[in-house]
């Protein structure tokens, strides 16, 4: 009774602590107590590990050890690795909640079943946690100050069980000005084992979040201000820090599953679920006024050819006067006050309303003792409504909803209306303006697999065939694209994706296992890449087509009571990919819709990971990765004028042999842990990453830009060369102390990342698509603008205390 009362109190405290704030989910899995990782010293250790240990040891070790750099494993972005609950796709932001609810996760790093970067599957049919509870308080200072969380599992009568989780985080970052987080996350899981043997599971989860984020900038700005953690997105308002870039979310999620044994040989898993809510991103907008961003290239010394002016600007930056190096909110209010009620500056809130639902029916039939079939159907609909809202008028009365980029245009200055059906509408706080549209995706797929499994062999063949339909629905009628060109339903793009994969595994003994997986798939591009400008144009790209992916993966696994070892070799090829970008073209001085087609990449390499239990007290983990991640052809760059879809140019981009950004070509980590069962544990680890590159820009390598605008071989090389980032290494340490009090445990953990406090590690970067233009006498000179980079955090400390009972 006392434990239950304490849990209720802690849940209420964590809710009240954050009831007035909304924040983004933050995954603290990397800071789990060392005490929770102590080995099970029994004869069942080997059996337990074979059945229940995650299949991806390399991913388990590297997922958080390399948080100090961009780490797109195998050269694929994180969003290409989906999260599913009983075949229903959910956002990976829910991972923390799902693990705390006791769901069994199976991490698959290979491209089986069409998931090109692997997947994480959560299963509700693998049992429920025993009755227990845990509450924690934690402090970090990295991104936010600290928080509280509580989790409880309880077995009820008549086959019911319930798990609940709630966590709150809040406060300002101790390292980066302007960074903050206020969030609360909650989840509940209900499970019911029926007398017939059927299983019912319902999972509900949500995160309410608001995060003040940092932004990368050029090395020039970092050097001038003398701080690699400089953040240009905030400024002082009435003596308080205010960030112009905030990210918010409120996206509740629900998944319901029903498992039934239809016959002696056939079982059914039926699932339905979805996510409904919204995400927001704020930014400053300016309308017939100068940019408010302090790190804009026109406000830095390097922009000026007059050395006297450049020196004056440099001195202002080196003094770190926040009126110049940060957003000057007071100046924005002053300019608005002199505009007669019309906003020259406003805080915009870009909003996406998510409405996505899925349904899945999966069958498994045992044809014989060693042969089984899996087959099923999956249907999904995703209707994402996207619009812009006036967040704050900064002292102005209203904002006239017109296209301010066209005010001085010789051709279109009389066609300014963003919403022709409500011309010259005066938008006030909370009103939609600029654009309003919905992208609707409908998917239907059938799949089947056959598995042959004996004591040593496991062979599977899988195939899926689907239908993918996408259309745009415009809710504003743009004046430059009147009637059906922007308003109402566009044409529907129909594609037919498919996947073919096969895998084979052989077990030599309970310790040794090898496997080989190959997959070929054609997949639909992201919906936003199928339109020239989905914000206000119903025009689709020319010849929309499927992307092709081919993957092969060979792996070896060794498992015993003393060690777990995995080694794998992989190859992943992508062809016929498409990317669409809306940007300003400096050569034509025109806003353009830029379509990059026929993108091809190749990733191949090896991964090695091991966990060796040297004794009952000592344990080591090791990971090594080496690979090559490159673009393999020169894609086509097509520029359309954003005002009337006129073709401006088409040329090839010199991308062949460029490296994929965000992934180290060589990486390694090693950690040693000491565990004393009297209540102490400590660990020390080192992480190294080398051969890293900034993400290359397609447009600046186009023949039109790199060859035609370059006045010398030196400038041409500047356009097509790719910056290699410096090698990075960190030393991490942690210390834990726990106390067993009856049937409960109190634990304390102190973790330190980047123990040596290195402040010059570049987290990652990307090339700017913009071009710098200046004159040298009568000659026009074009050069690429500086790369945008972000630096890693210095020494960071995480402390947590938890009570499990």
Locate each region found by the language model.
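Acidic/polar loop-and-plug regions of large Gram-negative outer-membrane beta-barrel proteins
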Residues: 199-257, 280-348, 412-427
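Surface-exposed extracellular loop regions of Gram-negative outer-membrane beta-barrel proteins
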Residues: 217, 416-417, 421-426, 469-480, ...
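Gram-negative outer-membrane beta-barrel transporters
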Residues: 571-573, 592-699, 800-804
């Amino acid at each position: 009774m006392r434990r239950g009362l304490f849990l209720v109190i802690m849940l209420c405290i964590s809710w009240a602590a954050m009831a007035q704030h909304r924040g983004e989910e933050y995954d603290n899995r990397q800071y789990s107590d060392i005490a929770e990782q102590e080995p099970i010293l029994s004869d069942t250790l080997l059996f337990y590990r074979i059945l229940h240990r995650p299949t991806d040891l390399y991913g388990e070790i590297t997922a958080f050890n390399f948080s100090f750099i961009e780490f797109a494993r195998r050269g694929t972005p994180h969003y290409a690795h989906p999260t599913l609950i009983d075949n229903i796709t959910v956002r990976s932001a829910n991972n923390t909640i799902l693990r705390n609810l006791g769901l069994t996760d199976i991490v698959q790093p290979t491209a089986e079943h069409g998931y090109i970067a692997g997947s994480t599957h959560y299963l509700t049919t693998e049992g429920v946690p025993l009755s227990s509870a845990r509450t924690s308080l934690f402090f970090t200072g990295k991104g936010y100050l600290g928080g509280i969380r509580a989790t409880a599992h309880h077995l009820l009568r008549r086959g019911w069980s319930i798990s609940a989780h709630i966590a709150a985080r809040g406060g300002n970052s101790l390292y980066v000005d302007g960074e903050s987080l206020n969030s609360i996350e909650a989840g509940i899981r209900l499970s019911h084992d029926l007398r017939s043997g059927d299983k019912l599971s319902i999972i509900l989860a949500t995160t309410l979040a608001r995060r003040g984020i940092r932004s990368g900038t050029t090395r020039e700005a970092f050097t001038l201000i003398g701080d690699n953690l400089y953040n240009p997105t905030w400024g002082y308002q009435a003596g308080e820090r205010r960030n112009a870039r905030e990210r918010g979310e409120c996206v509740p999620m629900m998944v319901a599953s029903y498992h039934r044994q239809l016959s002696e040989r056939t079982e059914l898993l039926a699932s339905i679920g979805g996510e409904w809510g919204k995400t927001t991103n704020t930014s400053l907008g300016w309308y017939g006024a100068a940019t408010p961003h302090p790190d804009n290239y026109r406000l830095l010394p390097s922009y000026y050819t007059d050395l006297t002016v450049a020196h004056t600007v440099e001195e202002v930056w080196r003094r770190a006067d926040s009126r110049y190096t940060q957003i000057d909110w007071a100046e924005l209010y002053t300019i608005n006050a002199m505009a007669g009620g019309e906003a020259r500056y406003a805080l915009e809130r870009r909003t996406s309303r998510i409405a996505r639902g899925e349904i899945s029916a999966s069958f498994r039939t045992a044809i014989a003792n060693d042969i089984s079939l899996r087959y099923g159907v999956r249907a999904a609909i995703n209707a994402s409504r996207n619009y812009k809202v006036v967040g704050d008028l900064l002292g102005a009365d209203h904002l006239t909803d017109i296209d301010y980029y066209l005010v001085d245009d010789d051709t279109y200055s009389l066609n300014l209306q963003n919403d022709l059906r409500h011309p010259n509408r005066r938008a006030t706080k909370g009103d939609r303006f600029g654009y309003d549209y919905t992208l609707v995706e409908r998917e239907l797929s059938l799949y089947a697999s056959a598995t042959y499994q004996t004591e040593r062999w496991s062979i599977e063949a899988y195939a899926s065939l689907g239908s993918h339909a996408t259309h745009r629905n415009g809710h504003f009628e743009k004046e430059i694209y009147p009637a059906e060109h922007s308003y109402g339903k566009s044409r529907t793009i129909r594609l037919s994706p498919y996947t073919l994969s096969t895998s084979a595994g052989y077990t030599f003994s309970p310790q040794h296992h090898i496997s080989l997986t190959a997959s070929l798939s054609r997949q639909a591009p992201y919906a936003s890449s199928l339109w020239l400008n989905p914000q206000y144009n119903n025009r689709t790209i020319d010849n929309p087509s499927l992307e092709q992916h081919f993957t092969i993966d060979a792996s070896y696994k060794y498992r015993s009571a003393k060690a777990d070892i995995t080694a794998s070799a992989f190859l992943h090829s992508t062809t016929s990919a498409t990317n669409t970008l809306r940007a300003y073209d400096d050569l034509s001085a025109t806003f353009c819709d830029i379509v990059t087609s026929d993108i091809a990449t190749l990733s191949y390499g090896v991964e090695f990971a091991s966990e060796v239990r040297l004794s009952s007290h000592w344990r080591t983990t090791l990971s090594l990765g080496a690979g090559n991640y490159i673009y393999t052809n020169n894609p086509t760059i097509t520029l359309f004028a954003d005002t009337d879809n006129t073709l401006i140019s088409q040329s090839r981009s010199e991308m062949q042999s460029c490296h994929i950004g965000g992934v180290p070509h060589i990486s390694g980590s090693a950690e040693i842990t000491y565990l004393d069962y009297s209540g102490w544990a400590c660990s020390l680890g080192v992480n190294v990453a080398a051969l890293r590159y900034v993400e290359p820009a397609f447009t600046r390598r186009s023949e039109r830009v790199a060859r035609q605008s370059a006045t010398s071989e030196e400038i041409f090389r500047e356009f097509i060369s790719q910056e290699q980032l410096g090698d990075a290494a960190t030393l991490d340490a942690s210390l834990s102390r726990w106390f067993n009090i009856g049937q409960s445990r109190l634990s304390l953990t102190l973790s330190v990342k980047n123990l040596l406090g290195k402040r010059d590690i570049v987290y990652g970067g990307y090339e700017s698509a913009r071009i710098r233009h200046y004159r040298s006498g009568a000659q026009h000179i074009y050069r690429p603008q500086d790369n945008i980079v972000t630096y890693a955090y210095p020494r960071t400390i995480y402390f947590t205390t938890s009570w499990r009972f």
